[in-house]
UniProtKB/Swiss-Prot annotation:
This protein's name: Adenosine deaminase
Reaction catalyzed: adenosine + H2O + H(+) = inosine + NH4(+); 2'-deoxyadenosine + H2O + H(+) = 2'-deoxyinosine + NH4(+)
Cofactor field: Zn(2+)
Annotated positions for site Important for catalytic activity: 221
Biological process per Gene Ontology, one example term: adenosine catabolic process
Function: Catalyzes the hydrolytic deamination of adenosine and 2-deoxyadenosine.
Lineage top rank: taxon: Bacteria
Classification via SUPFAM superfamilies: Metallo-dependent hydrolases
Keyword Glycoprotein recorded: no
Molecular-function GO terms, alphabetical: 2'-deoxyadenosine deaminase activity; adenosine deaminase activity; zinc ion binding
InterPro entries referenced in this protein's UniProt entry, alphabetically: A_deaminase, A_deaminase_dom, Ado/ade_deaminase, Metal_Hydrolase
A Pfam family per the record: A_deaminase
Keywords: Hydrolase, Metal-binding, Nucleotide metabolism, Zinc
Amino acid sequence: MIDKTIPLVDLHRHLDGNVNVKTIWELGHQHGIQLPANSLEELAPFVQIQGKENNLVDFLKKLDWMVAVLADLDAVKRVAYENVIDAASQGLDYAELRFSPYYMAMNHNLPIEGVVEAVIDGVRAGVKEHDISVNLIGIMSRSFGQEKCRLELEGILAHRDSIVAMDLAGDELGFPGDLFTEHFKRVRDAGLQVTAHAGEAAGAESMWQAINILGATRIGHGVNAIHDPKLMEYLAKHRIGIESCPTSNLHTSTVKDYDVHPLRKFMDAGVLIGLNTDDPGVSAIDIAHEYRVVKSEMGFSDSQLATLQRNGVEMAFMSDSDRKALYAKKAK
């Protein structure tokens, strides 16, 4: 199912959406934070999906307990470190971990730049110990407004040499991309790549904004592109990568079921698209799960799965030399 000769990657993976339940429990008790449960078993439903949520905003509430326990920068570093361990244990050769520094900082008034530093330090520590390559993507959480996003951007740009790209995430309907035009001009001027959550809760127009105004060369989710033939044609022609997260789309009620997910329509249209986990801690999945459901629920062949796997490598925010090295590693 997963082709061992092709690098296995996960490009849309939220670091702050992947905090182990045991870690939440331990950090909560360590810092005297009142948790909504009296045991690990009772805590799980508060931080993991037990079925489907009504919408994206309800889904995102599951993440709130994951950041509520980040009481100091050591906790942030621990979570970042454990994310690398988790990714490596799932057999990933390469991962892009994305995080929102303000979202991680806000509950305990941590310094935003300090959060960025702690994430970088935690990831570096994990990479030193495990056979995996990791790049970081900063997030501006649009739900908190333009000023908070500016503060996030400042913290990220202070460490731009350790970050490969910037993302826009959060309430897509309430905070459209054009509110962040100036933010992303600074991102591009700094030489960072751009991806954006778009076409998930909102329609195709959100994706056009992400591409034409923000400068996105990749789109997170993008399921609603299928309603705009011109957009589908544009995505294919210009090789705009779609970071597809099928199980997450099901959990947020973005799609009703796997068999109606537009993944196949993207592939049939020649769009560059790969599989990702999104918030694996919330969805309680790994990347292998996504390949399994695409095969069993959507009827993809092993050859088609290999194409998706290869697409992920081609979409990755890395240099051509690093890409060649990643392929060479699997060829040994």
